[in-house]
Amino acid sequence: MDNQKNLLLAVIFSLIVLIGYDFFFNPKTKVNQQNTEIEQNKTPIQNDEDVPSLLSKDFSSKIKLDEKRINFASKRLMGSINLYGATFDDILLRDYFKTIDRKENIKILSKENSPTPYFFRMGWASTDKTIPMPNKVSLWKAEKESFDENEPIKLTWNNGKGVKFDRVIKIDENFMISVEDEVTNQSGKDIELTNYSYLRRINYRPQNKFFILHEGPLGVFNDTLKEVSYDEIEEENEIVEVTKNGWIGYTDHYWQVAIFPENDKPFKARFKNLKNSINSVQIDFLNESIKSLPNNQSMKIKSYIFAGAKEVPLIDDYIDKLQINKLDLSVDFGWFYFLTKPLFYALHFLSGLFGNFGIGIIILTICIRIVLFPLANKSFKSMNAMRILTPEIQRLRERYKDDRAKMNQEMFAMYKEKKINPASGCLPILIQIPIFFALYKVLFVSIEMRHAPFFGWINDLYLSGNFISTSSFKSTSLKFVYTLNEETSPSFILRALGNTSHFPKGNFFPFKFS
């Protein structure tokens, strides 16, 4: 019996080390930077220095002195836009709050004069340095003082040399903002130009570093998600990717800001460490397609910005409507994506059906127990058969205590005679471990769990405080493995998920099963 336990523990521990390390510490995906499908454009605009003011050190000096703003409000967003640079630097979520008392809204973007500036700008660059392009200090004119999801707003900037820029900004009823620029050339000559965008975050690092969750810069390049840590950017100073049909952004635990360039257009994305500021990173893209605009003609280009909560059904809806490539990967479902996302939708359906997220967790756990019952039962039968042989095993150990090779030979002969495989209970256990990890991951990343009420005194299923620590996860994993090996009833699955899962401060579930 001890040999069987040792075998099970050895296999399970090896599995946790091999899978758990890769999954939870999540080494960054190596993306092939040689893009054979995209032709590199050999125009004068090839490097970051050619992008006007993109890396200017006096980034906010003029804007701090003189602000002009337009306000906006939609069903789920509110804030303002600074007309200097047409800067998005003030966005709040109307239906999400910092604390459960619902007094202070979640702020997505912050002004440049705030303690932690976080803002987004779009600009244009030309191969002709004599033609002024809109940048961070350009003062745009607005046709009105405010707008909402029902009526977009038009901004205009004229360079004084015959080139006019019209920018139409629309917000939908959720978290998507569309920006359509129209450039009209009446300069008397043809011009070449391209667009860029950048998102800058200053004086910020995540307060709680969850080792199973990525928070920070990320993007999709060549159909592959790339998550970049702040430490990587500081070490390498600059990380560059060239792709098309991709996007870049910042992700937090529950919120994100992402930029989506034109589809099917190659662009160069960059993650840049800002040395002149502490804990500051800029992510930007430069459109690699240099466009020629003849005199007396105009051109349009459209981009999208997502600024809001990572609600999976909404994100999937944007993927379908706007053809955004793999936006759902911004929700950190991890390596067990094939398990975690279906589990999320099952939980989403059940919590909607019963009107309570906690009830949804209970029902989903019961469903998992039912599905895993055949495996649990098989494991139980195998372990029970081994228990029956325990007296015989003890006698063999006493008889051959000085000859381990002979003892093992006699034990395996006994297993063969009794038609028992001592490892037959191992496979069912190994199959259940990824499901355990996936269920935990779903509950950890689901924004629906944040500030979700249950019953009675339980008004927040998330349980405020540090949600998880490495030590608590290791402890819980060991408890789970111990439970799988020691229970004599198929109900061990439910007990393992309910009674032994102490991920937060307190129980992972606000209830226990018996």
Question: Residue locations for each model-derived region?
Answer:
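Intrinsically disordered, low-complexity regulatory regions of eukaryotic regulatory proteins
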Residues: 20, 46-48, 250, 262
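Generic low-complexity segments that are intrinsically disordered, proline-rich and/or Lys/Arg-biased
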Residues: 35, 41, 45, 53, ...
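Short amphipathic alpha-helical "recognition" segments used for binding
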Residues: 44, 115-116, 242-245, 483, ...
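Soluble non-transmembrane domains of integral membrane proteins
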Residues: 69, 73-326
